[in-house]
C-alpha cells in the first residue's frame, strides 16, 4: 500500500474531522483554533490555510472544530457547522481529559511537524475553574464559506449553548440537518432563508453521523431507555416531523468506543444503495429505505469503529475500520458472503495510533483525514498500489 502523508501547517490544528472535495481542491475541516479550514490542492500537493473564519475561538483558550459538518453547494461554496471541543457531558476538554485519552507522548508528532514547544494547554484549558459557559460557549453557528473570496458568512445561529456535532447538507433541496452537543438535539436549516428549527432532544447519543436518502429523508438512530435497544430515527423534510420509529436496528447498540456508540458512518452509493457501519464490532450493513430494513453484510475489523466509506469508479467500497489503529478495508458489493470483505492492512503501521475520521476518493486516490493523535495529517492512498482481489 503506497501512502503519502501531509500535515496541516497550523500550530493549533490537531485533527481533520470533516472533508469535502470541490474540483481539484479538497477542503479539510479541522479541530483547532480560529483557522478551522485548510485546503489541499490536488494539482500541487500542497496544504494551505484558509482565512480566520472563526475569530471568536481564538481568545477562549481551547479548540473549536468542524466535526462531520461540511457540505458543498452547487456554486462551490461550503456549508459548515461549528462545534466546540466538548466532552459528551458538554464541558470543554481539559488537560486532565487529554492525559486520560491522549498521553503526552502523542504530542511528539505535532512537535516534529514544526511546533517543538507545543503543550496540552495550547489546545485546552488547564481546568474549568475560570470557564464561563455564557461567555465562552454561547452556542455555535452555521457558516457558508466562499472559496473565491476566502470569507465565511453566517447562515444562522444554533440555540443557546448548542453546537453542531454533525451537519448534513442537501444541496439539491437547499436544506441542512444536524445534531448537537451537548444534549443531542435534532435540527434542520432552510439554507435560503437561514431559518433553523430545533426539534428537541433525540435520546442518548446513538450515532456519529446521519444519512440523507436519495429522496431527501434524513435517517439516524435513537436509544430506547425502556429496553436499551437502538432504533431508527427518521425526519421527512416535507412532513417536518422527527419520528422516533419502533423499527429495531440492534437490541444492544454495543459498547462505547472513543466516546461513540451505535451507528458510526453511512454511504449512499451511486446506484442509491445505502451502507451503514456500527461503532461496536465494526459491522457493515445494507439499509433499504423503502422497507426500512437492515441486512448484516459482515464484520470489517477488530476493535470497532467504521469511520469512513468511499465508492470508487468500479463500484468497490473502500472503508476505514478498526480501533485504535485504522485498517483500510475493501468491500465488493457484487460478491455475496465473507469473501466480499478484504482487510488491506493498517493505514500507517509505524505509528502508535493512526485513527481516521474523514475521507474522500478522487481519480484512484483515497484521501484520509486523521484524528485523536495530535496530528492533523492527510494520508493519501494510491489504490492502484493495492493488489486486485478476485472472488
Features from the language model and the residues they span:
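Conserved beta-propeller blade signature
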Residues: 26-29, 78-79, 175-178, 218-220, ...
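Short, conserved, GDST-rich strand-edge loop motifs in beta-rich repeat architectures
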Residues: 83-137, 223-225
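Short loop/turn segments immediately following the C-termini of beta-strands
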Residues: 31-32, 83-85, 181, 223-225, ...
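Surface loop/turn motifs at the tips and blade-to-blade linkers of beta-strand repeat domains
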Residues: 6-12, 51-62, 155-161, 199-203, ...
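Repeated scaffold domains used in trafficking and secretory/extracellular systems
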Residues: 13-18, 59-70, 161-169, 204-213, ...
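Structural motif
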Residues: 34-39, 87-97, 137-141, 184-188, ...
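Blade-level signature of beta-propeller repeat domains, shared across WD40, Kelch, NHL, RCC1
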Residues: 352-391
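Residue-level detector of Asp-centered blade-edge/turn motifs that repeat once per structural unit
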Residues: 21-23, 72-75, 170-173, 212-215, ...
